[in-house]
Amino acid sequence: CYIQNCLRV
């Protein structure tokens, strides 16, 4: 993931 809050790929 490329987001600040991501719990997946």
Swiss-Prot record:
Localization annotation: Secreted
Disulfide bonds: C1-C6
One Gene Ontology term of the molecular function aspect: toxin activity
Keyword Disulfide bond: yes
Record bears the keyword Zinc-finger: no
Miscellaneous: Negative results: does not show binding with vasopressin V1b and V2 receptors (up to 10 uM). Shows a weak agonist activity on V1bR/AVPR1B (9% at 10 uM).
UniProt function note: Interacts with high affinity with oxytocin receptor (OXTR) (Ki=108 nM) and vasopressin V1a receptor (V1aR/AVPR1A) (Ki=319 nM). Acts as a partial agonist on OXTR (Kact=37 nM, 22% of oxytocin maximum activity at 10 uM), and as a full antagonist on V1aR (Kinact=329 nM).
Similarity comment: Belongs to the vasopressin/oxytocin family.
Record remark: domains: The cysteine framework is C-C.
Protein name: Conopressin-T
